[in-house]
Amino acid sequence: MNTPAAKLMILLGEQFACVKVTGRANFATSVDFKTILTELSAKKYSYYVIELSECSLMDSTFLGVLAAFGAKINPPGSDCAAQLIELRNANERLLELLENLGVIHLFKTCQGELPKCQEINPALCNPSREALTRASLEAHQVLMEINPQNVTRFKDVTKFLAEDLEKMKSKPE
């Protein structure tokens, strides 16, 4: 079954940047999501909000991209009390997934309306199969690095993705 990719929207406030995720956030959207987060991070916003009121579910690739951003903004040894990334209006299923993967500590979670902000339409890319595979591999590796208990969950997935990526690289174009 082909699940449509989530819709991503950028909202900018005075001191914060927000990415609103609508639909099922999966590997197909992960490259665009990572690109958006990287670009927003380069602009040095003091606070980031991921608005999830209309996000029904996230797969492990999307969660891994989110966790990698959380680890980058709140690195080990930093004041995690600051928690510069807020997950707003996440449903119980999403919070449970983040808890089970051992990455919830990287984020502040809350409910409620966003402050006034301006909507920006992101320029989305059309990632190749290789780019999607690489993003998925990196996302799962991050989940295993952050929480070693995830190694048993994702070791076979990462092995398969790494092998698949090597096959793609070795094929002549």
Locations of regions flagged by a protein language model:
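Charged/polar low-complexity intrinsically disordered segments, enriched in acidic residues
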Residues: 116-168
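Short acidic-hydrophobic, aromatic-tinged amphipathic segments that line or gate anion-handling sites
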Residues: 107-116
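Amphipathic alpha-helical interaction surfaces in cytosolic regulatory modules
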Residues: 27-107
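Short, flexible active-site loop motifs that bind/organize anionic cofactors or intermediates
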Residues: 20-23, 53, 122
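STAS-typified acidic loop motif
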Residues: 4-35
